[in-house]
Amino acid sequence: MTDQINKLDPDTAIDIAYDIFLEMAGENLDPADIILFNLQFEDHGGVEFVETADDWEQEIGVLIDPDEYAEVWVGLVNEQDEMDDIFAKFLISHKEEDREYHVVWKK
């Protein structure tokens, strides 16, 4: 018998990622990036729910099942509405009772 995963809806995943971003950005981003984000987020900011990539093992050193996680990006979008300056990529577990997350910060 397999356990059914109740996946996060995109809005919930976005809210979780953005809350974590606001809490941890000061410790993980370059001060210049924080200033850039604060100045441009109102006009060009984006928090996007994207298809979960299968290359997270390279980023975090752990093999994951993309179906068990949501991926959210926080960054700035350009004139073509493409996110071209990504400040953080979040991998958030769909398991509500044991929510875990991983973050890859802009270097």
UniProtKB/Swiss-Prot annotation:
Top-level taxon in the UniProt lineage: Bacteria
One protein family per Pfam: DUF440
InterPro entries assigned: dsDNA_mimic_put, Put_dsDNA_mimic_sf
Record-linked NCBIfam families: PRK05094.1
Family: Belongs to the putative dsDNA mimic protein family.
Function: May act as a double-stranded DNA (dsDNA) mimic. Probably regulates the activity of a dsDNA-binding protein.
Protein name: Putative double-stranded DNA mimic protein HSM_1473
